[in-house]
Amino acid sequence: MASHPKSSGLFARLKKTRAALSDGLVSLFSGNHVHFDDAVYDELEDQLIMADLGVEASAEVVSTLREQARTTQIESPEALKKALIDQLSLILRGAERELVLASDSPKPLVILMVGVNGVGKTTTTAKLAANFQAGGHSVVLGACDTFRAAAIEQLQSWGDRLGIPVIAQTHGADAAAVAHDAFATARSRGVDVLIIDSAGRQHVNADLMAQLGKIRRVLAKADPGAPHETILVVDGGTGQNALSQAAAFEKTVGLTGICVTKLDGTARGGVVVALAKQLPVSIPFIGVGEGINDLRPFQSADFARALVGGKSIE
């Protein structure tokens, strides 16, 4: 993916989550405490849970902070804040993976985008294509959401705007056939990346999940390694529902990555920590705005600082 200047402001984009967390922790970080006792750490754990970090991640973080306090004497609000950022960074680091093309990457690299309706999947598909394009790579898009005519039109509109070919058929067409045509086109043109936009679906919808399986089989027949990436798009504003969606798709489909979108408009961005803690799936990128350049590589340390309110990365 293309790099982004720090002036683009992840710190500012996560202000709603940071404000919600900071409001809850203001008494802890206000300098009123000479010593941080059990009551303070209990309150910290409650506030982390309320920020959608999840029970498991919140308990682990606070348990570690308690232990650190016993051995290193955390006695100031700033020391506690720094220790909190460090612990969140440690959890998030395991999910950090930038999606890049290597010299030995398959050609085309096939990326299948999946998710439920309304999470911004088609827009994220276009933004990802723009990122690869900005990095000097050729891209083809496959409009395999054939259940919604608007989805085909939306992707075609993005393709026209970006100058990226979109392989599509009519509304109601066989999505697997579209995927086949898209792969054949990408391979014949020597394209670097093929990104497939699939229909939004609930994991409990047997027919749509079967369709997704058919798309995967068709791609695998064309290239035994395809799809090389299966990326789930989730809406960060849904909080713990994003976690349940990710767990279900990981079990049903198998994922190589998760993209958390709409983080600029929610106070529930802490769910990224829960995803990193509870699922063995990377988070290659996050969505922090509506602009074409607002799909960012996920960077654990920067994200942790932006969540809690450490030194600005702007």
Where are these regions (language model features)?
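Non-catalytic terminal/linker segments enriched in charged/polar, low-complexity residues
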Residues: 1-100, 104-113, 128, 134, ...
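P-loop/Walker A NTP-binding module and the surrounding RecA-like catalytic core of P-loop NTPases
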Residues: 85, 89-314
